[in-house]
UniProtKB/Swiss-Prot annotation:
Residues 1-22 form the signal peptide. The lineage of its organism: Eukaryota, Viridiplantae, Streptophyta, Embryophyta, Tracheophyta. It is found in: Endoplasmic reticulum. It is an enzyme of class 3 (hydrolase). The gene is UGLYAH. This is Probable (S)-ureidoglycine aminohydrolase. It catalyses: (S)-2-ureidoglycine + H2O = (S)-ureidoglycolate + NH4(+). Its main location: endoplasmic reticulum.
């Protein structure tokens, strides 16, 4: 008679533990294998912010703390892969309450700079050097862009602004905000002058890509006043570039969503959201999208100027 009572006590005492375990599954990842993508929301059904993995990558620096000395970053003569665990943030010159990490600069042979700016409550930008144009793209948070004329623009995630060289402006933010910024010394053509442009990716039309399968948007006009452009390129899983590109243009790339394999020269790199790539002129380059979600990357490209200039 004692055995049934003992079993009953064991089962009863285990019930609270089972409830706790079930609760843990409910609040954690549990058995859900779905990624919380912008489309599905994962198990919780709550959609994460756009480009959340660009600022919170799968292999974030915190995940690599138990691998001292390990990095996926690579620097070679004609290309570089800069991954998040290698980012070094420090105060940006003349900016207020803002940290920056320079990812690409003339020190590696580029004719432009590409950097991340992390703004916080009460932060404010500084102007670029004289003769330098700037493009700002919002990855996280929001900013208020003010022109010298007094006009203002609110930029949310996936919005951007192109500021011509020597145009006075300021950017402020009162929340945690991450920007990717491109700057280069403007190459003038007599009689042509670029204009201020404020826009968002989703407002840009899809462009024809003969012979290719990816979707392409361009953030700036293709006309002569503009000496560079920013391409937004989307690949579905399994899609890849048909052309194995070799050209005189330089590239600065930030992977906003997804993962895949990037060929640079004779090297093949697994890449994911948050990774940055520098491509020098004439380095062979090719990309294939892998995984379960689409790839989207942002790509700097110099255009509309004779390479001899």
């Amino acid at each position: 008679m004692m055995l049934p009572r003992l079993l009953l006590l064991v089962v009863a005492s285990a019930l609270p533990l089972a409830s706790v375990a079930a609760g843990a599954v409910g609040v954690g990842e549990g058995f859900c294998s779905a990624e919380p993508s912008a489309a599905s929301g994962g198990c919780s059904g709550v959609r994460p912010p756009l480009y959340w993995k660009a600022t919170n990558p799968t292999l974030a620096p915190a995940h690599l703390q138990d691998l001292p000395g390990f990095t996926r970053s690579v620097y070679k003569r004609d290309h570089a892969l800069i991954t998040p665990e290698s980012h070094v943030f420090s105060p940006l010159p003349d900016w207020i309450n803002t940290l920056g990490a320079y990812l690409i600069s003339p020190a590696i042979g580029a004719h432009f700079t590409m950097y991340l700016a992390k703004m916080h409550d009460g932060s404010k930008s500084a102007l670029p050097p004289k003769g330098v144009e700037r493009l700002i793209f919002v990855l996280q948070g929001s900013i208020l862009l003010s022109e010298e004329s007094g006009n203002t623009h609110t930029l949310l995630v996936d919005s951007y602004a192109y500021l011509p060289a020597n145009m006075k402006h300021s950017v402020i933010s009162d929340e945690v905000t991450t920007l990717v910024i491109f700057e280069r010394r403007y190459t003038t053509i007599e009689g042509y002058h670029p204009d201020l442009i404020v826009g968002s990716t989703d407002k840009q039309p899809l462009l024809e890509t003969p012979g290719e399968v990816f979707e392409l948007r361009k953030l700036l006009p293709t006309s002569l006043p503009y000496d560079f452009n920013i391409h937004i390129m989307d690949f579905q899983p399994g899609e890849y570039l048909n052309v194995k590109e070799v050209h005189y243009n330089q590239h600065g790339l930030l992977l906003l969503e997804g993962q895949g394999i990037y060929r640079l020269g004779d090297s093949w790199y697994p890449v994911q959201s948050g990774d940055t790539i520098w491509m020098a002129p004439f380095v062979p380059q090719w990309y294939a999208a892998l995984g379960k979600t689409k790839t989207r990357y942002l790509l700097y490209k110099d255009v509309n100027r004779d390479p001899l200039i």
